[in-house]
Amino acid sequence: MDLLTTLSGSAMEGFFPAGWNLGVIDKLGDLRGEGLTKPRPWWNPGFQLVPCGTLADFDTMLGHAIALEIRQAKEQGRQLAMILPVGPMGMYRWAVWFLKQWGVDCLHVHGFNMDEWSDAQGNTLPGDHPGAFQHAMEQAFYGPLGAATVPLSQRHFATREKLPTYADRIGALKSKGARLVTVFGIGRVCHIAFWEPQFAGEYPSAREWAADTHRLGAKLHPLTIEQNALTSFKSWTTRVPAFANTIGPGLFLQSDGILGGADGMLGRGMQWQGLSLRMTLAHEPTPWIPSSHMTTLPGKLFVLSELLDGLDPECN
């Protein structure tokens, strides 16, 4: 007895994205060890899975990878465009630490925050509001860098006015030799930024889906709301906005490199990200699972080792 055998007539019927084959997804839940981590035919030869033993290891290693991208671009004399998330967050402290230790400034870096909470029209909170992603980035990354920080004119946030300019700005940078790196986490419904799986049903083809660069006032999936209630709002569901501004695959699939993170452990054996990680790694790329496309790009996905263990039920 499980969801598959009891779905009919339940409150969950019609809840999941229409393009999800729950039977296939259920089989992915069985994967563990080498069966999970072995490269799939569609993986980019430059894609690498990096297990991290502890959360401290995860934050340090991902922070080092971000700092190393910035340092290498500086040494190469290249501009660096970085699409940045708010979450995971612990890596920014270490990125700052490494850059300061190396004496590397960020004058060549262009930061593009990938998303922001909004209403249905794409209006966002003021940038200095404690709940705004802009505020979070200023506190975690741009501020602590001090005099070596990213220039104000090169910090871009996903507001109604600024997000539609991302594609042209990034395109102009790349045309002059800049490198584009996307830093990301994986959502409960396998979104990248707030690009939700159900959006796939709105496009006539995968090609048109892959070309869309952004969305203002994107309607979020209920599982996204609840994920953020648990991970960012301390269970206070009514404080989570139902819409967000977000980049789309037309931007993140243009990345020259990626740095991803999966750290969704909650403690006492509880977690929220194990199945989402398996869908990302082992499901053939499809617009209905946005994160499944990230393995087709070169770069690294840092993962808490516990998420690679078996997903055996355990009552808590």
Question: What is each PLM-predicted segment?
Answer:
Residues G29-V50, D57, V104-V183, T238-R239, ...:
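Ligand-binding beta-strand-loop-alpha-helix segment within the catalytic cores
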Residues L173-E202:
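A glycine-rich beta-strand to alpha-helix segment
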Residues R71-G103:
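Glycine-rich N-terminal segment of FAD-binding domains in flavoprotein oxidoreductases
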Residues M82-Y92, I186-H191, L266-G267:
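Gly/Ser/Thr-rich loops at beta-strand to alpha-helix junctions
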Residues L80, G177-V183, D256, G299:
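Conserved acidic residues
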Residues A193-P241:
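Class I SAM-dependent methyltransferase SAM-binding "motif I" and its flanking Rossmann-like core
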Residues A95-C106, D128-H129, P197-A206:
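A glycine- and small-aliphatic-rich helix-loop capping segment at beta-alpha/alpha-beta transitions
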Residues D2-G23, L36, P41-F47, C52-T54, ...:
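ATP/nucleoside-binding phosphotransfer catalytic cores, i.e., glycine-rich phosphate-binding loops
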